[in-house]
């Protein structure tokens, strides 16, 4: 962080950064998860209504648009959308965006470095938990990082047809991943808890990473269910062959966050060309074009 950046940080902002390091991340996340799963009837519906109002959640596109349709806060948070709310681009040479949100960063992986925020990079090897094979596959490739805010739809979809080959759960920190902290906490995305999913696709190997954050109670995939909790502190790896290797179609749901976070996509060198319109803060919607086959 240079001296100019330091001068621009207010005292209140410094406290926000310090709080991220000092707070009991796991305990807060466990407490939030417990409350979010409680069935409290009218109280739950009131909390959902206040949350939707505060964050301007667009309920008209939800499959269940009434607050009273949700028995728990988590049911609301991972709400499904109406059937045609997110049309999937059908161009067979194009990949589609996996999540609603905003582009945090995107572009070329410079050797083994990805851009986290302006002036701040982090290591591909660290992001992939030191996995040598994956690091080699995606070195000098392309990446897209999508931030999901509290108001966004929190189910994650497939950019293209793919077959799961490997999944790695990486324990880690639970820093908030909002844009301010993403700029001021070094290596944040490579330090946070995450689930790394490697797929075989018609575009070559693709990684889709679901990154946890403060009060992200759980991350789930459609083929394994809830990955965390438990949080044992150990890296866990799944490999898939034969009938255990689930295939998913372009646009199909592949996972979800119970309280939100970030999705990172990785592509090998010379595999895809990212869509020209993608840049920092571009609003994303599931099904819109992410990249084209080279």
Swiss-Prot record:
Its cofactor is pyruvate. GO terms for biological process: phosphatidylethanolamine biosynthetic process. Disulfide bonds: none annotated. The keyword Lipid biosynthesis applies. Pfam families: PS_Dcarbxylase. Catalyzes the formation of phosphatidylethanolamine (PtdEtn) from phosphatidylserine (PtdSer). This is Phosphatidylserine decarboxylase proenzyme. It comes from Mannheimia succiniciproducens (strain KCTC 0769BP / MBEL55E).
């Amino acid at each position: 962080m240079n001296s100019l950046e330091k001068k621009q940080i207010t005292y209140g902002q410094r406290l926000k950064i310090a709080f991220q390091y000092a707070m009991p991340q796991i305990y807060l996340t466990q407490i939030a998860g417990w409350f979010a799963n409680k069935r409290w009837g009218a109280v739950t519906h009131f909390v959902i209504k206040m949350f939707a109002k505060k964050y301007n959640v667009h309920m008209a596109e939800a499959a269940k648009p009434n607050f009273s349709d949700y028995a728990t806060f988590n049911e609301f948070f991972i709400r499904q959308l109406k059937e045609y709310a997110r049309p999937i681009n059908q161009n067979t040479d194009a990949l589609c965006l996996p999540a609603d949100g905003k582009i945090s960063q995107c572009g070329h992986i410079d050797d083994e470095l990805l851009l986290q925020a302006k002036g701040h990079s982090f290591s591909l090897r660290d992001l992939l938990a030191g996995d040598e094979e994956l690091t080699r596959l995606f070195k000098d490739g392309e990446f897209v990082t999508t931030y999901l805010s509290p108001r966004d739809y929190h189910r994650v979809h497939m950019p293209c047809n793919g077959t799961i080959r490997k999944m790695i759960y990486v324990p880690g920190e639970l820093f908030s991943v909002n844009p301010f902290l993403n700029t001021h906490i070094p290596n944040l995305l490579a330090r946070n808890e995450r689930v790394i999913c490697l797929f075989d696709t018609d575009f070559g190997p693709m990684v889709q990473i679901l990154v946890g954050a403060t009060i992200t109670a759980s991350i789930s995939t459609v083929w394994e269910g809830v990955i965390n909790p438990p949080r044992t502190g150990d890296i866990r790896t799944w490999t898939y062959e034969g009938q255990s290797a689930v295939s998913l179609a372009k646009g199909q749901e592949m996972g979800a966050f119970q309280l939100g976070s970030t999705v990172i996509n990785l592509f090998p060198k010379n595999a895809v060309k990212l869509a020209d319109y993608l840049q920092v803060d571009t609003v994303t919607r599931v099904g819109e074009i992410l990249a084209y086959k080279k």
